[in-house]
Structures are given as C-alpha cells and as structure tokens.
Swiss-Prot record:
Motif segment (PPXY motif): 203-206
Propeptide residue intervals: 101-162
Organism (species): Simian retrovirus SRV-1
Coiled-coil segments: 217-258
Protein name as catalogued: Gag polyprotein
Gene behind this protein: gag
Site (Cleavage): 100-101, 163-164, 217-218, 300-301, 526-527, 622-623
Zinc finger intervals, CCHC-type: 548-565, 577-594
Keyword Transmembrane helix: no
C-alpha cells in the first residue's frame, strides 16, 4: 500500500509539473481528489493500464452520464476543467517529452496498482466492493489513497456490486494475460448507461485468485423506478378520494339527510331536474376534491342526489365565499347594474336558489338602501306572479315565492318544484335590474341627451337602459325611445337621420350615425365657423335651394328670362291684323310708326310717353331773364351778338318733343 501511495503521489506531482509547463497552475490536493473521483465513476479505468485519447474520452462520457443522473451537486466543480486539461496533454504528448514521460509512468503505475488491488485488497477485507457506482454522500464517493492508508473501514454503497458469486478453484476462470481488455471497456461502459438493458452476467475476472464476492443484483432502471412511484401515488390519490367521500357520507348520515348504500355509490351523482340550457349543479361530496377547479357558478345551495336505489335526496349547501366576493367586487367597482355584474348574477341565478338564499346574497353584496329597494321590487314582482298562479290554479302563492309564513324554513323551501324556482329567479333578477345607477339624477328619459363627442350608439344604450328602468322593459316604450333618440341627439346626428327619419327604425338610426365621430364633428365646426353660422343653422341651411323666385310665374329655381311658361305663352298669342291707325300694315297700333295714313293724311302723334329718345336742351329759352350784365370784360361773353332784351312770359305751350 505504501508503494502504491508513493507511485500515485509521484505521478500526480509529474502531472502537476506537466500542466505547469503549459502555464496552468493546479493544486496537488485538487488533483488527488480528481483522480479519486475518476476511480469512483470509472472503476474500469485504473485496471486497463493504458492512457490514450480514446479511453480518456470514455472517461468524459462517464462524467457526463454521472452529471445527468445525479445532478451538479454530486460532481466536483473542477472535474470537467481538469479533464479538459489532461485531454490537451494527451493530445500533445508526442510533442512534449515531459508529458510523454508522465503518461508512460502513469500507465505503469495503473498496471501495477490494478494487479495490487486484485491481490491485496480482498485478503484484507473480503467484503470490500470492487466496483462501486456511487456512494451516499459526496465525501464517501471514493476515498483517496491517503484516506485508505489511514482507515480501511467499509463505507455503505448505494448500488450493488457487479460481480457474481464464484470460488477461487473455478477451472473456467481465464488467465489475466488472456483477457480481452478492449471488449471489457464496452461492457463496463454499459454499467453507466440507463438505456442499456440490465447486465445480469458477470464480467470475466481480472485475477484467477479472486475470492468469492456477494451475489450480483441488476442495476435499477430510473425510468422503471419512476413509473412505480407514479403508480403508487395514483393509488394513494384514489384511496384518499374514497376516504373523503366516506367522511362526507358519514356527516350526511348524522344530519339525517341521506342513506348509505355502498362505498361505490357513497358519493352518489348529482341530478337536478332542469330545462334545456340549464347548468347541472354539483354535489358537496366532491367539493373538497375539486376546490381548485371550481368557478363561482359551480357551487350552488340546493342540489339533488340520487342514491343507488334510485331514491332522490335534496340537500342545501351554503354559498361559497368566492361567489360572494366576486359579486361584491363587481358591484362595488362597476355598479350593481353593470353588464359584468349582471352576467355573474345570471350565472348564479340559472340554478336553484331559495328565497332565503336570494335575500342572503343581496344583503351581503349590496348596500343597505339597495337591499331595501331590491326587496320591495322583489315582493311586488312576487305579488304579480302569485296573481297569475292563482288564475292558473297551480297553488304557488305569495308565501311560497317570498319564503314567508309556513315556508320560512330552509327545509320547506328545498322541496319546491323546479318551476317555482324558475319563477323566483325571474322575480329576483327583474328586481335586480331595476336598481338605480349611483350618481344618476333621476330616471328621466327627457334628460338623457347626446353629448357633442359622444357616439350615437352609446347614447342610445343609455336611453334604452333608462327606459328599461322606467317601463320595466325597453320594448314597451320603443316608439318613445325612437322619438327621443332623434330629438335628443346632437345636430350632426339629427342632420344624418332627418332624411330617413320615417323610413327606418332605431337600428337604422344607429347605422346612419355610425361614422359620425370626433373628426366629423371637428370638420363640421370649422365649416360652420367659416360660414359665420352655428353648427345647427349650418346643417339646416346646407340643403336649401339657392336663388330667388321667378317674377313672371312666381316659382323658384329660375329667373324671368329663363321662364319656360312665359315663352310658351308668347308662342300661343294671336298675330296682329290690319293696323287701325294707318290702314297700311299688319301690326299693332301702339307699334305703328307711320306719319300718314293710307289716304296720305297726316297722322297725329302718339299720345303718352311712347318711345322717347334722349332729352335735348332747348334751342331758345322762353320767359328766361338774363341776369348777366353786359360787360366787355366778361370772359363768358365771347360772341359778338347783340344783347337780348328782357322778354315777358308767354302762354305758348311747351314743345311736344325736344
């Protein structure tokens, strides 16, 4: 053993020097730990006695398999780094003489240590494992040579020994010199590959004098072991489910609601008489198992279970807190009549809820005032329903609908017929929809008006919602809503609806105004500003016909010169006959220009204005007095005519023509 330690230490020292020549500094203790790890993961490596690139790469494959199997926490940090450094040394051993000498000495040490381990170790401890795949802890994977010199105690191994029981006197054991070492490499590599089938035959012994070893056990395949664990877990889950079902059944027996038939039918199955489209509720027996998969609509108060004998049992469960929490959050954030809140209410109301359940749910979700409003509307709806039931003669009175009087207990309400549950649902949801919106200043339809930039569809939605609260249903006042949809719309939407107002319905209004948005409003405001009008006046005057009326026919659209009626009337007038004035042509008398008649007698001039020419200045002034004195120095008196005397006024009439 001491000789082995000295040779091993000398080899490690030479390897350290060889690495140092390549500029790599390593610690002596780290190299010792590395080769201890090599011996633990590759027990076949020291026994071959040859170091070449092929075997060293096989060592690297063993490292990788060990890493994939046990994880990084079982592999030293420097294992792969040292493996790469030694691989480079082996690749270049022909170039560096020092490296070649170190490799040769290492091969000699491996051969010597291989034969020494086979002859000495079994004599010292016959129960010592020869080939070990892994240990329980990282420090016990394979002790170094120094640790073996100090302590030879046996360490527990996780995997069994890969040897079969044999005797030293077996005549079939071959000579170590005749062993095919290359073939053994492939067989030993199979020990670490989980994809290979279990190796059940023993490998050829390296030494004929090897004592007997424990019996070989096959290496457990990790996949098979994992499948066994999964099967065990599945069986455990099934047993736990059956255990929970039996506990639930026992609790129901104590309350006197059900009878037990057998473990197979202990859970029973949920059956609820339902109409088409109704969600079938689930029983409480599976609540603990499906708690993580439940949604608010999967937990309902009243359910009906049928046992193995075909007998139906009804039982009542309390509301799940997730339902109340979700509905409370929706009512607080979005409002009691918001679409999301109503969707949750309808989802819960699709199943069997007693009047007490409705009262509990509303009191927990809504405020005090809203709860009272809902309760008053609910009672009013129940009175109307009770009157119809009385006329139909089905016996479902007001006390049954409201859960009062003889039907105030939960046990009595659980026995209701499915049709009665449907009437309670309709009355409760109708009362919920009539709850007022917070911040709404009264439910007045005339006060609902479209904003300047509000889409027309949103405005109609607000109008229909308000009408539904007032009339109970928007269909009841659809004509009134249509009228207000036009009158309370903004000017742009009114202008778009006006030509088709009496030709389409409310959906047509929405389609006509679908393209009217902020950009349209902005362009319309700019056009009205440029024309100096308001938006409303601009839209009202935009389609009016331009131009005045015709002065001849009084109609719009043309002028008098283009009047077709005047031209048509002129074409129908009679032709003039013989002129009564001159008796010489066919023309009208007012158009006659003759001076004499057909006999040659002079004709008097036309009376009246007639056709007058340009007025002319008189050639002689009558009755005018010259106030300009006669003076030779007057520049305006240039003619050598004698001055006129003052004339008196005369009675001569003015000339007829100028």
């Amino acid at each position: 053993m001491g000789q082995e330690l000295s040779q091993h230490e000398r080899y490690v020292e030479q390897l350290k020097q060889a690495l140092k020549t390549r500029g790599v500094k390593v610690k002596y203790a780290d190299l010792l730990k590395f080769f201890d790890f090599v011996k633990d993961t590759c027990p076949w490596f020291p026994q071959e006695g040859t170091i070449d690139i092929k075997r060293w790469r096989r060592v690297g494959d063993c490292f990788q398999d060990y890493y994939n199997t046990f994880g990084p926490e079982k592999v030293p940090v420097t294992a792969f780094s040292y493996w790469n450094l030694i691989k480079e040394l082996i690749d270049k051993k022909e170039v560096n003489p020092q490296v070649m000498a170190a490799v040769a000495q290492t091969e000699e040490i491996l051969k010597t240590s291989s034969h020494t381990e086979l002859t000495t170790k079994p004599s010292q401890n016959p129960d010592l494992d020869l080939i070990s795949l892994d240990s329980d802890d990282e420090g016990a994977k394979g002790s170094s040579l120094k640790d073996k010199n100090l302590s030879c105690t046996k360490k527990p191994k996780r995997f069994p020994v890969l040897l079969t029981a044999q005797t030293s006197a077996d005549p079939e054991d071959p000579n170590p010199s005749e062993v095919d070492w290359d073939g053994l490499e492939d067989e030993a590599a199979k020990y670490h590959n989980p994809d290979w089938p279990p190796f059940l035959t023993r490998p050829p012994p390296y030494n004929k004098a090897t004592p007997s070893a424990p019996t070989v056990m096959a290496v457990v395949n990790p996949k098979e072991e994992l499948k066994e664990k999964i099967a065990q877990l599945e069986e455990q889950i099934k047993l736990e489910e059956l255990h929970q079902a039996l506990i639930s059944k026992l609790q129901k027996l104590k309350t006197g609601n059900e009878t037990v038939t057998s473990p197979e039918t202990a859970g029973g199955f949920s059956r609820t008489p339902h109409w088409p489209g109704q969600h079938i509720p689930k029983g409480k027996c599976c609540a603990s198992r499906e708690k993580e998969e439940q949604t608010p609509k999967d937990i309902f108060p009243v359910t009906e279970t049928v046992d193995g004998q075909g007998q139906a049992w009804r039982h009542h469960n309390g509301f799940d807190f997730t339902v109340i929490k979700e509905l409370k959050t929706a009512a607080s954030q979005y409002g009691a009549t918001a679409p999301y809140t109503l969707a949750i209410v309808e989802s819960v109301a699709d199943n069997w809820l007693t009047p007490t359940d409705w009262n509990t749910l509303v009191r927990a979700v809504l405020s005090g005032g809203d709860h009272l409003l809902w309760k008053s509307e609910f009672f009013e709806n129940c009175r109307e329903t009770a009157k119809r039931n009385q006329q139909a003669g089905n016996g479902w009175d007001f006390d049954m609908l409201t859960g009062s009087g003889n039907y105030s207990s939960t046990d009595a309400q659980m026995q209701y017929d499915p049709g009665l549950f449907a009437q309670i649902q309709a009355a409760a949801t109708k009362a919920w929809r009539k709850l007022p919106v917070k911040g709404d200043p009264g439910a007045s339809l005339t006060g609902v008006k479209q904003g300047p930039d509000e889409p027309f569809a949103d405005f109609v939605h607000r109008l229909i919602t308000t009408a539904g609260r007032i009339f109970g249903s928007a269909e009841a006042g659809v004509d009134y809503v249509k009228q207000l949809a036009y009158e309370n719309a903004n000017p742009a939407c009114q202008a778009a609806i006006r030509p088709y107002r009496k030709k389409t319905d409310l959906t047509g209004y929405i389609r006509l105004c679908s393209d009217i948005g902020p950009s349209y409003q902005q362009g319309l405001a700019m056009a009205a500003a440029f024309s100096g009008q308001t938006v409303k006046d601009f839209l009202n005057n935009k389609n009016k016909e331009k131009g005045g009326c015709c002065f001849k026919c009084g109609r719009k659209g043309h002028f008098a010169k283009n009047c077709h009626e005047h031209i048509h009337n002129n074409s129908e007038t009679k032709a003039p006959g013989l002129c009564p004035r001159c008796k010489r042509g066919k023309h009208w008398a007012n158009e006659c220009k003759s001076k004499t008649d057909s006999q040659g007698n002079p004709l008097p001039p036309h009376q009246g204005n007639g056709l007058r020419g340009q007025p002319q200045a008189p050639k002689q002034a009558y009755g005018a007095v010259s106030f300009v004195p006669a003076n030779k120095n007057n520049p305006f008196q240039s003619l050598p005519e004698p001055p006129q005397e003052v004339q008196d006024w005369t009675s001569v009439p003015p000339p007829t023509q100028y």
